[in-house]
Swiss-Prot record:
GO terms for molecular function: bile acid transmembrane transporter activity; organic anion transmembrane transporter activity; serine-type endopeptidase inhibitor activity; sodium-independent organic anion transmembrane transporter activity. This is Solute carrier organic anion transporter family member 1B3. It is a multi-pass membrane protein. SUPFAM superfamilies: Kazal-type serine protease inhibitors, MFS general substrate transporter. GO terms for biological process: bile acid and bile salt transport; heme catabolic process; monoatomic ion transport; organic anion transport; sodium-independent organic anion transport; xenobiotic metabolic process. Disulfide bonds join C459-C489, C465-C485, C474-C506. It catalyses: estrone 3-sulfate(out) + hydrogencarbonate(in) = estrone 3-sulfate(in) + hydrogencarbonate(out); 17beta-estradiol 17-O-(beta-D-glucuronate)(out) = 17beta-estradiol 17-O-(beta-D-glucuronate)(in); taurocholate(out) = taurocholate(in); estrone 3-sulfate(out) = estrone 3-sulfate(in). The modification Phosphoserine is found at S293, S295, S683. Residues 453-508 form the Kazal-like domain. A conserved histidine residue in the third TMD (His-115) may play an essential role in the pH sensitivity of SLCO1B3/OATP1B3-mediated substrate transport. Changing I292M: In a colorectal cancer sample; somatic mutation. It is linked to Hyperbilirubinemia, Rotor type: An autosomal recessive form of primary conjugated hyperbilirubinemia. Affected individuals develop mild jaundice not associated with hemolysis shortly after birth or in childhood. They have delayed plasma clearance of the unconjugated anionic dye bromsulphthalein and prominent urinary excretion of coproporphyrin I. Hepatic pigmentation is normal. Residues 49-67, 120-168, 238-255, 354-373, 426-537, 596-629 are extracellular. The gene is SLCO1B3.
Length: 702
């Protein structure tokens, strides 16, 4: 009999160990799947940011409209965040995250689809690509007393071309795809973190969040690498003979294979969604047992948390909840500390989002860097410095055991240092390019403060040139001309990228003495002084990014500690909504609108409508781009000072040292900063349990 009991106990012990292993493995599988979803999410976000200039050129749109497309991600997120935050924890969280990843991937693929329906990219009005012949039309030169063929185009052909170019309205699909990506990303962070908080071993949540923080950095690494690679590839690669393309990646009309990045990120997101559909709602229960006792489990959970609603009083509870919501909202909005910190955070985030959206365009236009080179350099700069800064910020707060006021001072100090380094960008603004008819007169002697936009001169007045054409050539006098015709060039030799033009009358009038009045395709390169400024800019960017990331880890910690504990979820949710609406959506739009004001030459399509900008006034561009960022950050620093004095008054003499719980929030803050302002929603599920504790509870119940 004793032997029989011993065998039963041994079997029960083995069964218990097997269940324990299965349950722990379920949680580990969730962590692995969530890690892949974080990589996919970060990859998609980086791909959109580095492709925004390519999209602007491909669809022939302004920077402000491109900014609206970029902000559509936040629009999609705002559409469902309330539903996800409230109902998400009550439903099957892994499956919701899986659906989100699936939508995220679908949105990325939808973004790339217009490429397959728009036809071949025409970088010039004279570019007519015939895949069967693998050739392009010849460039126009100065034809005295003759009329160029494009001036004699029949209205029927013009109207036909206009209809074809109306395909540029397919940017709407890019807008919708990015918005769908925003909808899909919404559940990943809040539901993922709450799931970890519910089912991780006691005290291990911070470790898991820190690991997600580190793993999430793989996404930007892959994104910048792919962005740099695809930016080198011509947009219609695989469809046209690349030897017939006469522009290079440094040309302002160059469009890389932007669509490939979205295809890759979309497929990666879809693949990352698959594991979530096979994970249980509760990893602490086997799948069959969970299905049988689902209703009992829900009732038990609600009893444990004192949240069971009386079904007969649902109407009263809804009214009470609505009233309580508005009372809570009033409470945080009448909290001076919260309002001040909300405003300064909004200003700083708006400055960051606006400047980061157009930093690639800035490097291209200001320093003459190709999109591929800009993506590669920014990736090398951003990833290690941001990771180092985030770690350093958390280490300093923990090492010196900073009080809440001390954390606010630390945040202000890092913001001030970053602000001062940002001021150093202004001396690094390069002079505007020497472009005849835009920044200087055709004789090359009279520079003008703003572009003159007078393409015709006596040296090309008899050439019958198309004034709207943008086919830049660089004269051997160092001046860029809008086209070979407007340079007065009479003849040419060579083909495609290697074409050289001769007998250029407008080059001659500048007083060049060598009698070799020639020009070659493309804009004149930047001088050595501007190149040196670029490397200084990169060095300052490294330091600036380091201090920004070091102080950026404090935002969520300060937010949750300046309001009542029961209001911190609402405080973070409301802050996220305001920042997404006024920062994530609006900042790229008004940054882009002001950048558009610095454009010197716009493209025009066959319909005669304005398209994308071909060249900017470098000086004005730099002042607007940097000045707007400074204009947003300076009042934020003033508000920081007010915030610190107000905190001293409120917390003077109180012990506000960082607790273990605050250090947990710091890990979550690092995660939040890495993922560009994603939402953090505190746990709304069951209480945290370890696998061991859950087994003990079950044994006690039996």
């Amino acid at each position: 009999m004793d032997q029989h009991q011993h065998l039963n106990k041994t079997a029960e012990s083995a069964s218990s160990e097997k269940k324990k292993t299965r349950r722990c493995n379920g949680f580990k599988m969730f962590l692995a799947a969530l890690s892949f979803s974080y990589i996919a999410k970060a990859l998609g976000g980086i791909i959109m940011k580095i492709s925004i200039t390519q999209i602007e050129r491909r669809f022939d749109i302004s920077s402000s409209l491109a900014g609206l497309i970029d902000g559509s991600f936040e629009i999609g997120n705002l559409l469902v965040i309330v539903f996800v935050s409230y109902f998400g924890s009550k439903l099957h969280r892994p499956k919701l995250i899986g659906i989100g990843c699936l939508l995220m991937g679908t949105g990325s693929i939808l973004t790339s689809l217009p490429h397959f329906f728009m036809g071949y990219y025409r970088y010039s009005k004279e570019t007519h690509i015939n895949p069967s012949e693998n050739s392009t039309s010849s460039l126009s030169t100065c034809l005295i007393n003759q009329t160029l063929s494009f001036n004699g185009t029949s209205p029927e052909i013009v109207e036909k071309d206009c209809v074809k170019e109306s395909g540029s309205h397919m940017w709407i699909y890019v807008f919708m795809g990015n918005m769908l990506r925003g909808i899909g990303e919404t559940p990943i962070v809040p539901l993922g973190i709450s799931y970890i908080d519910d089912f991780a071993k006691e005290g291990h949540s911070s470790l898991y969040l820190g690991s997600l923080n580190a793993i999430g950095m793989i996404g930007p690494v892959i994104g910048f690498a792919l962005g740099s690679l695809f930016a080198k590839m011509y947009v219609d690669i695989g469809y046209v003979d690349l030897s017939t393309i006469r522009i290079t990646p440094k040309d302002s009309r160059w469009v890389g294979a932007w669509w490939l990045g979205f295809l890759v990120s979309g497929l990666f997101s879809i693949i990352s969604s698959i594991p979530f559909f096979f994970l249980p709602k509760n990893p602490n229960k086997p799948q069959k047992e969970r299905k049988i006792s689902l209703s009992l489990h829900v009732l038990k959970t609600n009893d444990d948390r004192n949240q069971t609603a009386n079904l007969t009083n649902q109407g009263k509870n809804v009214t009470k909840n609505v009233t309580g919501f508005f009372q809570s909202l009033k409470s945080i909005l009448t909290n001076p500390l919260y309002v001040i910190f909300l405003l300064l955070t909004l200003l700083q985030v708006s400055s960051f989002i606006g400047s980061f959206t157009y930093v690639f365009k800035y490097m291209e236009q200001q320093y003459g860097q190709s999109a591929s080179h800009a993506n590669f350099l920014l990736g090398i700069i951003t990833i290690p410095t941001v990771a180092t800064g985030m770690f350093l910020g958390g280490f300093i707060i923990k090492k010196f055991k900073l009080s809440l006021v001390g954390i606010a001072k630390f945040s202000f100090l890092t913001s001030m240092i970053s602000f001062l380094f940002q001021l150093l960008y202004f001396p690094l603004i390069c002079e505007s390019k020497s472009v005849a008819g835009l920044t200087l007169t055709y004789d090359g002697n009279n520079s003008v403060a703003s572009h003159v936009d007078v393409p015709l001169s006596y040296c090309n007045s008899e050439c019958n040139c198309d004034e709207s054409q943008w086919e830049p050539v660089c004269g051997n006098n160092g001046i860029t001309y809008l086209s070979p015709c407007l340079a007065g060039c009479k003849s040419s030799s060579g083909i495609k990228k290697h074409t050289v033009f001769y007998n250029c009358s407008c080059v001659e009038v500048t007083g060049l003495q060598n009698r070799n009045y020639s020009a070659h395709l493309g804009e004149c390169p930047r001088d050595n002084t501007c190149t040196r400024k670029f490397f200084i800019y990169v060095a300052i960017q490294v330091i600036n990014s380091l201090f920004s990331a070091t102080g950026g880890t404090t935002f969520i910690l300060l937010t949750v500690k300046i309001v009542q504990p029961e209001l911190k979820a609402l405080a973070m949710g409301f802050q996220s909504m305001v920042i997404r609406t006024l920062g994530g959506i609006l900042a790229p739009i008004y940054f882009g609108a002001l950048i558009d004001k610095t454009c010197m030459k716009w493209s025009t399509n066959s319909c005669g409508a304005q398209g994308a900008c071909r060249i900017y006034n470098s000086v004005f561009f730099g002042r607007v781009y940097l000045g707007l960022s400074i204009a947003l950050r300076f009042p934020a620093l003033v508000l920081y000072i007010v915030f610190i004095f107000a905190m001293k008054k409120k917390f003077q003499g109180k012990d506000t040292k960082a607790s273990d719980n605050e250090r947990k929030v710091m890990d979550e803050a690092n995660l939040e900063f890495l993922n560009n302002g994603e939402h953090f929603v505190p746990s709304a599920g069951t209480d945290s349990k370890t696998c061991n504790l859950d087994m003990q509870d079950n044994a006690a119940a039996n």
